[in-house]
């Protein structure tokens, strides 16, 4: 069965196909960028940033506007949430309304824009002798970040460029683990590195509340938030994947995914893990010392720090999601910026801002303000003092060589929603069927969504 969102997407494709042939991309990589003049262009940039992030972005934009030699003016405009931007982009592409010159987009969203003939292949700009990146520049980007916007299923086009990324990490209470170790309740030191150690500590915590807890909330080892990124993270940690890029098919029912979900189901059945009922409930309970472990985005570090300082005041840090593989496999994600198809001059101007936005020094400043990871390794030099004074951020930063991403395919949003719907049925045992059977059904749904989003 195709979801409501999937049906809406198919309708949008059909509507746009009446205006122009969907997917009939011109060969932007062959464009003669060397002779395009970006002088005097205005770049309208749609983004979702607010608060401190929006303030820092405004500074970056102002610095670029004041210093670039071409007289380019960037206008950064908050257009609401990621979903708001996505909806506005698809409507604009369908109706022929004016597009921005730069837009924040997740990879699965940029795939949709591409199918609607709406994006520039950035490869041609990167390869430009006059405007592109040097080999040294390219080598400075973390490989997993740099390759994340390349789409093999569309001939290797690059539909976005990364200004930042976040990572799924395990948050843990250092002091509580130390208490459990001192009491002989667990058999290892430090954070758990394997699922077996994670279960041992989670079950021990549920039976041995933290002495410094500041709330009456019952102690629990782990609180699971129902989210496709949690699903992917626990699957990656067992050496699996949720998508087969070569076959262009979902693998949500792989042996590793089944093992991951059975593991989490077992934790709940033993009373060692619980659900997250309200947004950020796990973060709050972690702060008060009621929950030993959570798994979530590294960009949440400052919010966890606040929760802890207002709660139990314990020491905490982050580590890799416990894994069965030799090395960690960390789920990395984040929105890139894409360049909509407008005019060559405006497209080049947008690229020149992106190029500035992703320079090492600007990335360091952006990383400090946003708590995202910078996309360049050399930014660590400018962040050295911050990294050394923030052990949790340092621990996460050191995991950057071990990254893997969720599928950059159209129609992923309704699949994510379905994963989040199915997870509690497995976790709590309310669906009594074997996990394999439930995930087979989930995988069929996902592949139907993929087909609907890729054909018309």
What is each PLM-predicted segment?
Residues 31-34, 51-72, 419:
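Short, polar/charged alpha-helical segment
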Residues 63, 281-283, 299-302, 306-307, ...:
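Mature extracytoplasmic/periplasmic domains
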Residues 66-69, 73, 125-130, 149-229, ...:
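Helix-loop-helix "hinge/cap" segment bordering the ligand-binding cleft or interdomain interface
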């Amino acid at each position: 069965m195709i979801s409501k969102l999937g049906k809406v997407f198919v309708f949008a494709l059909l509507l746009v196909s009446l205006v122009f042939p969907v997917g009939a991309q011109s060969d932007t990589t062959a464009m003669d960028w060397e002779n395009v003049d970006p002088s005097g262009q205005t770049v309208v940039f749609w983004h979702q940033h607010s608060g401190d992030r929006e303030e820092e972005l405004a500074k970056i934009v102002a610095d670029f506007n004041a210093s670039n030699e071409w007289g380019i003016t960037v206008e950064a405009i908050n257009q609401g949430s990621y979903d708001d931007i996505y909806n506005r982009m698809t409507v604009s592409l369908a109706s022929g309304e004016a597009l921005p010159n730069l837009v924040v987009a997740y990879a699965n969203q940029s795939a949709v824009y591409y199918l609607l003939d709406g994006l520039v292949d950035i490869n041609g700009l990167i390869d430009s002798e006059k405007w592109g990146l040097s080999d040294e520049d390219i080598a400075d980007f973390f490989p997993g970040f740099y390759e994340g916007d390349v789409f093999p299923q569309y001939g290797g086009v690059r539909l976005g460029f990364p200004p930042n990324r976040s990572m799924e990490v395990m948050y843990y209470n250092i002091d509580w683990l130390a208490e459990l170790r001192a009491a002989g309740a667990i058999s290892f030191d430090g954070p758990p590195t394997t699922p077996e150690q994670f279960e041992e500590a989670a079950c021990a915590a549920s039976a041995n509340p933290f002495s410094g807890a500041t709330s009456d909330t019952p102690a629990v080892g782990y609180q699971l938030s129902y989210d496709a990124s949690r699903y992917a993270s626990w699957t990656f940690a067992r050496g699996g994947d949720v998508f087969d890029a070569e076959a262009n098919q979902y693998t949500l029912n792989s042996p590793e995914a089944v093992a991951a979900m059975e593991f989490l189901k077992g934790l709940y059945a033993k009373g060692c893990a619980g659900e997250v009922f309200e947004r950020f409930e796990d973060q709050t309970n972690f702060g008060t010392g009621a929950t030993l472990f959570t798994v979530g985005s590294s960009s949440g570090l400052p919010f966890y720090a606040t929760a802890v300082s207002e709660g139990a005041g314990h020491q905490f840090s982050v580590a890799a999601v416990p894994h069965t593989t030799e090395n960690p496999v960390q789920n990395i994600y984040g929105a890139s910026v894409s360049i909509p198809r407008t005019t060559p001059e405006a497209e080049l101007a947008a690229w020149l801002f992106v190029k500035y936005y992703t320079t090492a020094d600007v990335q360091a400043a952006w990383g400090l303000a946003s708590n995202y990871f910078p996309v360049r390794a050399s930014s660590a030099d400018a962040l050295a003092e911050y990294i050394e004074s923030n052990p949790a951020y340092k621990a996460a930063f050191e995991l950057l060589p071990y990254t893997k991403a969720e599928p950059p395919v159209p129609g992923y949003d309704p699949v994510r929603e379905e994963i989040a719907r199915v997870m509690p049925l497995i976790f709590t045992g309310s669906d009594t069927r074997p996990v394999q059977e439930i995930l087979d059904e989930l995988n069929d749904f996902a592949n139907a969504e993929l087909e609907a989003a890729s054909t018309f």
